[in-house]
Amino acid sequence: MRQGFVKAAAVTPKIKVADTKYNAELILDMMKESTRQGAKIVVFPELCLTGYTCQDLFLQERLLQGAKDALMKLVKESASLDAIFFVGLPFEILGKLYNVAAVFSHGEVLGLVPKSYLPNYNEFYEARHFVSGAELATEVVLPDGSSVPADRDLLFVCEQMPKLRIGVELCEDLWTPNPPSISHALAGASVLVNLSASNELTGKDSYRRELVSGQSARLLAAYIYASAGEGESTQDLVFSGHNIIAENGQILAESKRFGHGILYSEIDVERLCAQRRRMTTFVTEDQTHTEILFSLKIEETKLTRFIDPAPFVPTDRQNREKRCDEILMIQAMGLKKRLEHTGANAVVGISGGLDSTLALLVTVRAFDLCGRDHKGITAVTMPGFGTTDRTYDNAVKLIQSLGAEFVEVDICQSVNVHFSDIGQDPSVHDVTYENSQARERTQILMDIANKKNALVIMVIALLVLL
């Protein structure tokens, strides 16, 4: 949890339908394994204590009591584990049955978050058993005598890392036009968890992946999606255990479908908060959310997530070429506007290196977009003390192949005069030696541009201006 990184786990146990004792033991084992691997946020699927596919057994008191007893067992026996857990179960509140996520940590239930949107179309009929928790806001007394909130609008805030603020939604909630995760994020949630039981249809995995990725991007948040898998009844549906962990549109980790197990990745909470600060249109609203504190130990987080050493350069050749063409077109369109507005020609200094080559290619593309002859581009080579035959030959061939006007100005004599004027020893190859040549080249380009009614085009970094 140092430097803003928090390890998360999305867990799919191989449950037995309606066997709450078996499921509780299995879930407890996976909770222990997750924390052994350093996970601090551990998310299980929707209704995992009973199974999603219990159908009318959900209406039986024995199953509901078994689920409640199983929850209390998990809470008690996980008290020594340093993590916050999210486990799904059916829960009766005020005589009605809700599909809830129980949230607990260090032997204490922090709250119950009910599902808001109950699918009752196509292959789904949740409204047969459950009621919506969209308007639920009450206190529930648990078997141990503790009273906890049952409310959709709960935020779980880490005392040791206040930027770690977690909001909860369940399965269908994400698939609706107005998911609860939107209000959670606007109330400050940096991490969103989804306890799901999403069945498989041909092509549904792609839609699910895009949904999770898109929601994390839209809300500048991390999104942990844990779905039901093996063990559920296959009478009507098949569940694949498709788990996903995403961060601001990037899929950090994704499980292989049609299995069970634990998916891990690390979430960069500080990065998410920094991105929200930069986006001035991301305005947190004064919500009615209730904040509930929990504690975690601050420990080193071993990073397993992929860190791209070249984040702007796609490894796939086709995508790389597409990205390069996009960059070239963006630059060329910007230059095209200036050329059309001024009616000017262009002057480009060519050394044979990457920067000047890019400047010339962008200029050529801009002239093509304007429908202008490349002879309006003056390409200038300015050999100096360090110019090699290779870079010089590259520069000349490039200019000739693109059909630009070729001009050569040797700067050695003028730079030597300048060295004499300022008392610089030509044998001392220091910053003055290097920058004197660069400034001489810039002066030449500016003067030629004045003569030709042209703009000087170059790729430049702020450092060059120092």
Predicted ranges, named:
Residues 1-349, 365-374, 406:
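Enzyme catalytic cores with a strong preference for nitrogen-chemistry domains
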Residues 40, 51, 77, 82-83, ...:
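N-terminal beta-alpha lobe that positions the nucleotide/phosphoryl donor
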Residues 91, 346-356, 414-415, 459-465:
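A glycine-rich phosphate-binding loop feature that marks nucleotide/adenosyl-phosphate handling sites
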Residues 193, 346-350, 354-396:
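ATP-dependent adenylation/pyrophosphate-handling site
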Residues 193, 199, 220, 415-424, ...:
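Nucleotide-activated chemistry modules centered on ATP-dependent adenylation/adenylyltransferase
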Residues 217-218, 361-367, 447-452:
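Alpha-helix C-terminal capping segments
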Residues 262-264, 293-311, 372-432, 438, ...:
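A conserved beta-strand->alpha-helix junction
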Residues 328, 332-336, 364, 378, ...:
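Generic hydrophobic alpha-helical scaffold/packing signal
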